[in-house]
Swiss-Prot record:
Protein name: Nucleoporin NUP42
First-listed, main subcellular location of the protein, grouped into a coarse class: nucleus
Chain ranges of zinc fingers (C3H1-type): 1-25
InterPro entries, sorted: Nucleoporin_NUP42, Znf_CCCH
Length: 449
């Protein structure tokens, strides 16, 4: 370990915490002690006693506040030369002897931490511009000196994906030179801004300081703010107006409806997709204003064939308020087939197969074709027979009689339609894994407790 030269001179301020060696033996120690020890004669004249001896303390033995207590004590004209050196040192620094000699350095550090020097800001910005220009980094990006500061103006922020998208848009337009000119223009603006920041004059420095000190006001929200297009004009037909609850709707606009050539209808009339208020009778047999009770899947009162028949939401006649009543006129139930003269039940019951129909009646989901003339179904176009027997057309185009409705969509399967393996599985107490039948069980094998 090296010997501390300041300790040999008697002015090491670290004391025992010094990282160099302080020798403690031989003549060095004697000289060190003798240096801080006043002559007995001077002490006698000063303190009035020959037994008293004033020893000048070393610099590292002072208090942490570096207050010179020597000025509080009486001193003689023949005092030690060390104190004269101390006074001479403090006078050269320009601070009183009671002040810390290192206070100037600490105050400068605190002031630099409290407020950033403007000269350092200019040096940092100039250095960053030189590095940015020579490093070959991405040009089309913003720059900010500090995280708390706003971005310096004059730089464009475009990602490679945005440039690629703009190139594809210009290529689709058949004008790739537009993309090339735009990129070259952005590159020239970037180089010009770099050159301006590297060579700042006093007026531009003042403008830059004002820009950095002003609060940021050009920041917009990522979801609600309007984003500027990359090259002055957006390639996509966007609407800058944010949608509100009043404008949000699934309803098609008038332009799309005009292009379609017809209104949205289920039964061929002017009925919306999910029903509308009937003109002659409401859905549940009560009049009044349009309420939740008027919501219906039924078509309006005017049918496809010009007949003035009134419909009801659940198959009852429109002249009564019940869900099952006698119909004075031909009523079309919502989910059943057409009936001639009997009452229509809730879901299409009470069929008559022998009545002659004067007008064609059409329900919502299945086309009941009765009477002369062609009848258009919702899904299948069929031609009705010219005889007086009512028939119905299913969704798959197969004609069947109303009396045979429960033969195909039955809840139970007859035993003669099951295979021996399926019948054995139904008769067993538990199904075998991998052999469970997919058909409904027979009614006579069900054991309801």
């Amino acid at each position: 370990m090296a010997i501390c030269s300041f300790f040999l001179q008697g002015r090491c301020r670290y004391g025992e915490k010094c990282w160099n060696e302080h020798p403690r033996g031989g003549s060095s120690r004697y000289q060190s002690q003798n240096r801080y020890q006043e002559p007995p004669g001077n002490a006698k004249g000063t303190w009035g006693s020959s037994s008293q001896r004033y020893v000048q303390p070393s610099s590292f033995s002072r208090s942490t506040t570096w207050v010179n207590r020597d000025n509080e004590k009486p001193s003689s004209g023949s005092h030690s030369g060390f104190d004269n050196r101390n006074v001479k040192f403090t006078a050269a620094t320009g601070f009183p002897s009671s002040q810390n000699r290192f206070a100037a350095l600490s105050s400068q550090d605190n002031s630099r931490d409290a407020q950033t020097d403007k000269g350092n800001i200019i040096d940092d910005i100039t250095n960053d511009m030189e590095i940015w220009e020579s490093s070959g980094q991405w040009m089309f990006s913003v720059y900010s000196m500090l995280r708390e500061k706003k971005n310096i103006s004059g730089f464009a922020d475009f990602s490679p994906e945005e440039l690629r998208l703009e190139y594809y848009a210009c290529q689709a337009e058949g004008n790739p030179l537009k993309y090339i000119n735009a990129v070259q223009q952005l590159g020239s603006k970037w180089k010009q801004r770099i050159l301006e920041l590297k060579n700042l004059n006093p007026s531009s420095k003042m403008a830059l300081f004002n820009e950095l000190s002003s609060p940021s006001s050009d920041m917009t929200s990522g979801y609600n703010g309007q984003q500027k297009p990359a090259f002055g004009s957006s390639s996509f037909p966007t609407n800058n107006t944010a949608p509100t609850a009043a404008t949000f709707s699934f309803k098609a606009d008038a332009a799309n409806a005009a292009k379609a050539g017809a209104t949205n209808s289920l039964a061929g009339s002017n009925v919306p997709a999910f029903g509308n208020k009937p003109t002659s009778a409401p859905s549940f047999g009560s009049g009044g204003a349009a309420t939740a009770a008027s919501f219906s899947f039924a078509p309006s009162s005017s049918s496809n064939f010009g007949a003035t028949t009134s419909t009801s939401g659940f198959g009852n006649a429109s002249n009564t308020a019940s869900f099952q009543g006698t119909a004075n006129s031909a009523a079309a139930p919502a989910f059943g087939v057409a009936s001639s003269s009997t009452a229509a039940t809730g879901f299409g019951g009470g069929f008559s197969t022998t009545g002659a129909m004067n007008t064609g009646v059409r329900d919502l989901f299945s086309a009941g074709t009765v009477g002369p003339g062609p009848v258009t179904s919702l899904f299948v176009q069929t031609t009705g027979p010219l005889h007086a027997t009512a028939s119905s057309t299913s969704l798959d185009g197969q004609s069947f009689r109303p009396s045979a409705l429960n033969t195909t969509n039955s809840l139970f399967t007859p035993q003669n339609e099951l295979s021996a393996e399926e019948l054995a599985q139904f008769k067993a107490q538990r199904f075998t894994l991998g052999k469970i039948p997919l058909k409904p069980p027979p009614a006579d094998l069900l054991n309801v407790s």
